[in-house]
Amino acid sequence: YMENLETFIRVAREHSAYPVLITPLERRCFMDEKHLGIGAHSDYVAAMKQTAEKNNVPLVDLYSMSRMELKKAGEKNSRRWYMFFPEGEYKNHPEKSEDNTHLRYDGAVNFASLIAKGLREIGGIYAELLLDDLKL
């Protein structure tokens, strides 16, 4: 995994691009209303952080930010961000869904805003790529 990340970094730099690593989004893994279990991606997050530091590449820690958002929202309220809906709600997806991985529109917007926040915090060329205010 780390070698693969380093290949992406090297190729990006060879093409005059500015690499940035973004840790994976946390899955919904609540043990109760406010407490998350150990995330499914924690080993990948640690490896990515190590690779970013070793290669002097900025990192947006979406994993940590999304865990904080999930804890703040709680088990029940965070369902609105993921593919949780009752049977018959959607014509093209008539069956019930309790998907703790894939996002609905509101979840995608919410977590993308965390990535934008992270890029702004890095600053420089990364922040310059962002619009000041986007109305969705």
Language-model features: locations:
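Alpha-helical cap/lid subdomain in secreted, periplasmic
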Residues: Y1-V109, S113-L131
